[in-house]
Amino acid sequence: MWRLKIGDYGTKNDPYIFSTNNFAGRQIWEFDPDAGSVEELAEVEEARLNYLKNRFNVKNSSDLLWQIQILREKKFKQTIPQVKIGDRGEEITPEIATTALRRAVNIFSALQSSHGHWPADNSGPLFFNTPMNEDGGWGLHVEGHSTMFGTVFNYICMRLLGEGPDGGENSGCTRARKWILDRGGATGIPSWGKTWLSILGVYNWSGCNPMPPEFWKLPYFLPISPGKLLCYCRLTYMPMSYFYGKRFVGPITPLVLQLREEIYIQPYDEINWSKLRHLCAKEDLFFPHTTVQNLLWDALHNLVEPVLNRWPLNKLREKSLEAAMTHIHYEDEASRYMTIGCVEKPLNMLSCWAEDPNGDYFKKHLARIGEYFWMGEDGMRVQSFGSQTWDCAFAVQALLACNLTDEIGPILMKAHDFLKTSQVTDNPPGDFESMFRHTSKGGWTFSNKDHGWPVSDCTAEALLCCLYFSMLPPEIVGEKMEPERYYDAVNCIISMQSQTGGVPAWEPRRAPSWLESLNPIEFFDEVIIEHDKVECTASALKAMTLFKKLYPKHKAKDVENFIRNAAKFIEDTQKLDGSWYGGWGICFTYGTWFAISGLVTAKKTYSNCLAIRKATDFLLKIQCEDGGWGESYRSCPNKKYIHLEGNRSNLVQTSWAMMGLIHAGQMERDPTPLHRASKLLINSQLEDGDFPQQELTGAFMGNCMLHYPTYRNIFPMWALAEYRSKFQSSKIF
């Protein structure tokens, strides 16, 4: 059976893998044919069959394979009896709230790894591997409608794995191929798909819009310099431009020739590829290209590319390809060959293979590829790159809010150790600014230290946890960090703030806003330049406020300015209905919780801040009949609040809204909405103390969703903890 291995497993005799912190937080699934008792194997099979039976109702994995493994290893058994609140006027009591909270803490503590973090799936761009929809296609994410991108990718993957093209009407390949052909064939695949199909040899490079590697030779002062782009955009098109510049095509095998016949509605040799460059299936089109943008691509394709591929300018092409590979190798080494994410990892790895199939660069990539695979009861998938630090920081805050520190000291100490071990303690190697990198010293990444890419909100949330730990007895939570490490984190956060007062995710804003209109990616939004995010700003505001209290002398003026400007940014970006748009969660519920929590730390209250009053009204207005909150992922692409179908609730979003209202002082004005929400959380708790997996709650790039299975544990526990604490202190119980 499959087993999750944590840390340096399998690395001792491998010369192609290296780490900055002894592989803390590294997660690798391995298949062991001899592992598992009869009972454990039966439990895994039951979980698999239950998912299969309910996959169109609850599409997201509950991460049961990891839970089964770790709970059996720890011999966990929930010993606290389940509690329920009746519908006939029964009220919540301190005993009921405390019991539900302890049950949640009990199981969640058992799910902690030996390294101190909470291993979990973090499924991002699921067009790599996602369950088939009922119509025979695949979506951009697990809950999304079928797209040409997802369906063509998964059809080709099935064929590469040995499935035949015609296996009967119920065959996955048969249904997928019909879906593709019924919509005009694979010529309608978006630009990223066109690139990958060209590399494979089932599409022609002349049908792709230009991605000239000369881009990497542009001077920095130009607004379209690669150094001014969003890092994800920059690092995706880096290897793509290498492949485009070389017109690289893999081996033309019999299977490749068969695929050419299977996914198009006309003979492959008769397709006019050049006319397909702007074509995109309507199912995939989220960000249409403007006329100006299409004219730009046409000019590059018809005028510039022919010149660059002829003497003497073909010498420039050769130098540009070398420059692209130099950047690729730099980014690979700086991230210990994890790269920045799952979209970039295979592109960089394939670039190294194209350069030298037997070279060390490619072998170093292979040594890290296992960290991108995750096993659940729904099978294996490619995940984003792990959310170890992000989940751990939220978990710590939730556990601390429970006010059970004396009972869970060992859990907190291990989490503290993980966060201390995971801080990035150096800048990127060499002359990192010439490689378009920003300072990283003092930051925290989304996953682990080896990843090497700090994120502003990950840094802020982890710093906040470490500051909390510094206020607790070291014999319970471990020794606090050296002050210089807090200073480094604060310096990192300050360096990210924009002139608006807002804070972007990965790097400071460097480019003008109009550059976003040149977005070539048809299914993503806000991917060309960095954008200030309300969540990043709020996280940073919370951390900086506590830091100022504990270390008032370090960069006092800079910290004060940061706090003032961040609070103003949050107030200035509020929507007319009182909400905030969340970029990393779904969506207005998520953003509004963050915004309120940030403003409150800046001494804003319901009485002195109009933004908090409007936010409170927004949250109360969208509360569901059952006392919860439930927002559809469709809010993200539509940029307006949309309820879940059937006006049903989602427990994670209910928790966000609860905490937002608690921070806004709703307890003191009218606790009834919070009583109703808490009742829903308590009554939804499962027999073992877990909470049920429901809809997706994470998001990115406006149109793609993320799956965070630990959210269902962390946020209901956190909300119940704050609810219980506030009611006890206000003597409403």
From Swiss-Prot:
An annotated Gene Ontology molecular function: beta-amyrin synthase activity
Active site, renumbered: 457
Tree of life domain: Eukaryota
Entries under InterPro entries matching the protein: SQ_cyclase_C, SQ_cyclase_N, Squalene_cyclase, Terpene_synthase_CS, Terpenoid_cyclase/PrenylTrfase
UniProt keyword annotation of Isomerase present: yes
This protein's pathway: Secondary metabolite biosynthesis; terpenoid biosynthesis
One cellular component term from this protein's GO annotations in UniProt: lipid droplet
PROSITE patterns in the record: TERPENE_SYNTHASES
Swiss-Prot/TrEMBL keywords: Isomerase, Repeat
Annotated catalysed reactions: (S)-2,3-epoxysqualene = lupeol
One annotated GO biological process: triterpenoid biosynthetic process
Assigned EC number: 5.4.99.41
CDD domains from the UniProt entry: SQCY_1
PFTB repeat spans: 121-162, 426-468, 486-528, 563-603, 612-653, 674-715
NCBIfam families on file: squalene_cyclas
Job of this protein: Oxidosqualene cyclase catalyzing the conversion of 2,3-oxidosqualene (2,3-epoxysqualene) to lupeol, a pentacyclic triterpenoid with anti-inflammatory properties.
Family: Belongs to the terpene cyclase/mutase family.
Name the record gives this protein: Lupeol synthase OSC3
Species of origin: Citrus sinensis (Sweet orange)
